[in-house]
Amino acid sequence: MIPELGHFALILAAMLAITQSILPLWGAQRGDARLMGSAAPLAVAGFVAITISFAALIWAYVTNDMTVVNVVANSHSAKPMLFKITGVWGNHEGSLILWVMVLAGCSAAVAAFGATLPSALQARVQAVLGMILLGFLAFIIFTSNPFERIWPPPPDGQGLNPLLQDIGLAIHPPLLYVGYVGYAVTF
């Protein structure tokens, strides 16, 4: 049930990204303060939805939910908790969710700390971030679903790639993504 909640949260985030891409941009074009003002709440709501999805994937790893293909391919019940959690972003699907969560976090940060920006500029920035989010979310939902189920579930997973079982994996991708993905705000 939790993986389905995570998948639903991704779909909800995609719908919010569509709205974030259109309404603020349209408001900036028309000079409509109400539509431009929708950018911040949409950005925060999208961040919350993606965070719920990421948390659902972490939950699947921590609880060894072997009905999720991603968990079977990248986790094992005998792994230490650190490598179960870092295994979430040690694969293609999980790293994409981390990517969009960081991007949505940057969008939410613009919403929270960009009050001094002109409203038309903030609306346009949020619209562009919404478009980027939508592209990545569509890719995840349609081609790289991390919540895909398998039945019957195997007794245990294959485990994380041994090359990725390093403390550096715990900190390297999140820090790299904060810097790498954060530059999307400047565009």
Which ranges hold each PLM region?
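Polytopic transmembrane helical bundles with strong interfacial aromatic enrichment
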Residues: 1-187
